[in-house]
Amino acid sequence: MIFVIESKLLQIYRNRNRNINFYTTMDNIMSAEYYLSLYAKYNSKNLDVFRNMLQAIEPSGNNYHILHAYCGIKGLDERFVEELLHRGYSPNETDDDGNYPLHIASKINNNRIVAMLLTHGADPNACDKHNKTPLYYLSGTDDEVIERINLLVQYGAKINNSVDEEGCGPLLACTDPSERVFKKIMSIGFEARIVDKFGKNHIHRHLMSDNPKASTISWMMKLGISPSKPDHDGNTPLHIVCSKTVKNVDIIDLLLPSTDVNKQNKFGDSPLTLLIKTLSPAHLINKLLSTSNVITDQTVNICIFYDRDDVLEIINDKGKQYDSTDFKMAVEVGSIRCVKYLLDNDIICEDAMYYAVLSEYETMVDYLLFNHFSVDFVVNGHTCMSECVRLNNPVILSKLMLHNPTSETMYLTMKAIEKDRLDKSIIIPFIAYFVLMHPDFCKNRRYFTSYKRFVTDYVHEGVSYEVFDDYF
């Protein structure tokens, strides 16, 4: 295949030297560049063969981007690039992706090609489509990266005068640097105490990398980078590490002394609440709690919402007292574990059943019924049964009716349903059965009158109501 490509290029070269019109010549040049671009894809390349091929080539400005293609070959002998540069290919033209040859060579860590391009006039301050100069691309070993930094700076790379799309300079964009590289970049004049357009400093950004390390953060702190600075959303580095699914305890230990664990971001989250929300182990949460003199109500509420009875116990051991409001919230959010913990510690809310009904947590209703919570509590004129009607929930209604509400409760239930003009259809059978099982109900004029009106207002007008004539 290489022989075929070489033959094609030789034929194009011969045709170019004959008496051929301009358009045919341009077609030949474009064809030659096409075959040269194919040659770039072969693993085995011969410099002499390459030089022969170049005899048929003149830079055409077409979309083959020959110089870019060869600069992107790992381990390529820089003499191939040198031949292209001597042939007239410009090191300061972009390909279709907005990359310069110098950016491409920097990305693949080919310092010899970087040096070759720079000596032939490549602009070390040119920006790609991400607004990054070659200094942003610092892959490779420490020695290779430092060598490339020296090359770029030697040929005029400017310091601290460029930012990429995220508002980062080259130093800030390097999210996982080695200590040697970081110090080298700083030694040539880069400013360490800077932030990106989101207000994140080097520690923030390192924590967002794939493999953040406590050792890296430690020497960043020694270089004067703040471990407690909040970004524009109010997140400190500790917020970030606490929000991750996998927690790095060494990093948490490193950041804890300098950060208030109750400091809230603009979304109302603190490092402590983020640990709770991400279902972190209790011992890790205890580590943060041990640094705080104040345990906020928000922390307790988050524990309840996420059903963390284990954390409630830790908080209680630190002196935090719970009350009926906490029990009520646990019922409302369906936190069975927290309800059980509070109940075991004699913390209750007498009208808990009412709020369990409002939340429509059947399991919570069952748990409260099992623990003998009353179905007779009335809140603002509404009963547990009237709220079942409002919610159109016959399942919970049937559970409550099986636990013997009082006659007064049923009277108030009917009053609430009529007052709010609720649909009576789901409760009529339950009330009828209740009256049947509680004959004393109809011996009370107030109860009986209300019941008669409640039923007759619902049943069709043509129905006889003589069944009620025996009373009063």
From Swiss-Prot:
PROSITE patterns: ANK_REP_REGION, ANK_REPEAT. SUPFAM superfamilies: Ankyrin repeat. One of its GO terms (biological process) is symbiont-mediated perturbation of host apoptosis. SMART domains: ANK (SM00248). GO terms for cellular component: host cell cytoplasm. It is found in: Host cytoplasm. The keyword Repeat applies. Pfam families: Ank, Ank_2. Inhibits host apoptosis. Acts by associating with host apoptosome. May interact with host caspase-9-Apaf-1 complex. PANTHER family: ANKYRIN REPEAT AND PROTEIN KINASE DOMAIN-CONTAINING PROTEIN, ANKYRIN REPEAT-CONTAINING PROTEIN-RELATED. This is Inhibitor of Apoptosis OPG037. It comes from Vaccinia virus (strain Western Reserve).
